[in-house]
UniProtKB/Swiss-Prot annotation:
PROSITE patterns assigned: HPT
Keywords: Phosphoprotein, Two-component regulatory system
Record's protein name: Phosphorelay protein LuxU
Phosphohistidine modifications at: H57
Listed GO biological process terms: phosphorelay signal transduction system
Organism domain of life: Bacteria
Matches recorded under Gene3D superfamilies: HPT domain (1.20.120.160)
Record function comment: Phosphorelay protein which receives sensory signals from a sensory kinase and transmit them to LuxO. At low cell density, a phosphoryl group is transferred from the sensory kinase, probably on His-57 and this phosphoryl group is further transferred to LuxO.
Gene (name only): luxU
InterPro entries: HPT_dom_sf, QS_phosphorelay_intermediate, Sig_transdc_His_kin_Hpt_dom
TM ranges: none
Domain HPt: 18-113
C-alpha cells in the first residue's frame, strides 16, 4: 500500500485540516475515482480521449493533494501529451488509467475503512 499512498501528503493534509476531517475528504476523493472509472467504461462517453484529457487535468490536482503519486504522475503525463498533440493509443491509455484508478481506490478505501 505504501507504494500507492504518499503518507507524508496525508500527514500534511491532516495537519492542515485536522485529522478528523481526513476520512471525509478521502471519501470525496474515492467518489471522484468511482465516477471516473464508471464514465471511462460507459458507452455514453463517446469521446474517450476527450474524457481522458478532462480527468487527467482534474487528477493532476486532486491526486497530488492526497498523495496518490502514481495516479498523479500518469495524469501529468497524459495532460502533457494531450497538450502537445501527441498521438496516443486510446484503448491502452484508458485501460492503464482504469487500472490506476482501481488500485488507488482500493488503497485509499483501505486507509479510511
Amino acid at each position: 500500500m505504501r507504494e500507492w499512498i504518499n503518507q507524508s501528503k496525508i500527514d500534511l493534509l491532516a495537519k492542515e485540516i485536522g485529522e478528523e476531517n481526513v476520512p471525509i475528504l478521502v471519501n470525496i476523493f474515492l467518489g471522484e475515482l468511482n465516477d471516473y472509472q464508471s464514465k471511462l467504461v460507459s458507452d455514453t462517453v463517446a469521446d474517450k480521449l476527450g474524457y481522458l484529457k478532462e480527468i487527467s487535468h482534474a487528477l493532476k490536482s486532486s491526486a497530488a493533494s492526497f498523495g496518490a503519486d502514481r495516479l498523479c504522475a500518469k495524469a501529468v503525463e497524459l495532460d502533457s501529451r494531450a497538450k502537445s498533440g501527441e498521438m496516443m493509443d486510446i484503448s491502452l491509455e484508458v485501460e492503464h488509467m482504469l487500472e490506476l484508478l482501481k488500485q488507488t481506490h482500493q488503497c485509499y478505501s483501505d486507509l479510511v475503512h
